[in-house]
Amino acid sequence: MLIRLLLLVICLAGPGVAEEIRIKDLVRFDGVRGNDLLGYGLVVGLNGTGDGLRNAPFTEDIMSNLLERLGVNVTGEQYRPKNVAAVFVTATLPPFARAGAQIDVTVSAMGDAKSLLGGTLVMTPLNGADGQIYAVAQGTIIAGGVSAEGQAARVVQGVPTAGTIPEGARVEREVEFEFARLDRVRLALRSPDFTTAGRIEDRINRELGRGVATMLDAGTVSLDLGRLGPPARVMGRIENLEVVPETVARVVVDQRSGTIVMGEDVRISRVAVAQGGLTLRVEEQPMVVQPNPFSRGETVVVPRTTASIQQRPGTGLAEIPAETSLSRVVAGLNALGVAPNDMIDILKSIHAAGALHAEFIVR
């Protein structure tokens, strides 16, 4: 199967022109973060695609506990519905979220349910790492796939055993954080870089005065807010200031999907590339051999192997000049007429030869 190739070229507005980015898009406020929430509950209303209670006994326990809380006595009763599934529910409580705010949740099957499509999550408390309940989730699930089956076949597209509920949880408890009392805040860069951190320091000091911002390292800029007024107002001014971030030459390769992403600053030294195009094919076709009549012989299966080697016409040796930009790299690889999966191997080889001057990430 051919590996699909998606080559994304990140181009700037014009040659030699760098774009200014807001500081809020380059950093996060140290200590201001979301909190993960987790709960487990029941999804009801499934069209016969729920848990098989023999294989997922915890579903019956969860259902019994829920019905007992609602005043329904189920002690000693045996019931095996197919429209119920036990699920894990996860969400992230954003910073500064107030009671009554609604947040998105993700629902994932715990047992052997075939699909959560069309199901409804019933009231499920969501706990934080401290064991306290911070939100309650409930709503109709939007599944990410679909499945259909008959007596002898089943077709599945996507992942029908997981889904989301947009704004499916309501915040019940707030995380206390007194931002207004802070007199010092640290900015944490999303992509640490000394040059970018220095530019952020210079830009803030030009706007608010010398000594307000101090670069501590490649990933941290400290702010002294004590003499500038209310911290929220000051941070509102700072986060909308713009700087030019330093870009890093980077190539990211995803071997599973055949995706290659390269930034504009990728350069390579002078190098020659040849691509082989050798294909080896081995097939096994077992053959049944019957004995002669009345020979008392046995029927046996004889292995039969067919092997072949195919060599595509050579594309020759292609030379890529020194200090070649991204566009020339793409043109050079396309000139070889290589397949997408071969292009990934060529990039690996160029990097191994020391000619690709960029961070090379393989996933």
Swiss-Prot record:
Does Signal count among this protein's keywords? Answer: yes
Q: Which UniProt keywords apply?
A: Bacterial flagellum, Periplasm, Signal
Entry's Pfam families? FlgI
| Gene Ontology MF terms in the entry | structural molecule activity
Question: Single Gene Ontology BP term?
Answer: bacterial-type flagellum-dependent cell motility
The stretch of residues making up the signal peptide is 1-18
- Give the highest taxon in the source lineage: Bacteria
Listed under GO cellular component are: bacterial-type flagellum basal body, distal rod, P ring; outer membrane-bounded periplasmic space
Q: Where in the cell is it found?
A: Periplasm; Bacterial flagellum basal body
- InterPro entries with a match to the protein in the record: Flag_FlgI
Query: Signal: is it a keyword of this entry?
Result: yes
Question: Briefly, what is this protein's role?
Answer: Assembles around the rod to form the L-ring and probably protects the motor/basal body from shearing forces during rotation.
What does the record note on quaternary structure? The basal body constitutes a major portion of the flagellar organelle and consists of four rings (L,P,S, and M) mounted on a central rod.
Q: Which family does it belong to?
A: Belongs to the FlgI family.
Protein name per Swiss-Prot or TrEMBL: Flagellar P-ring protein 2
The root-end lineage is: Bacteria, Pseudomonadati, Pseudomonadota, Alphaproteobacteria, Rhodobacterales
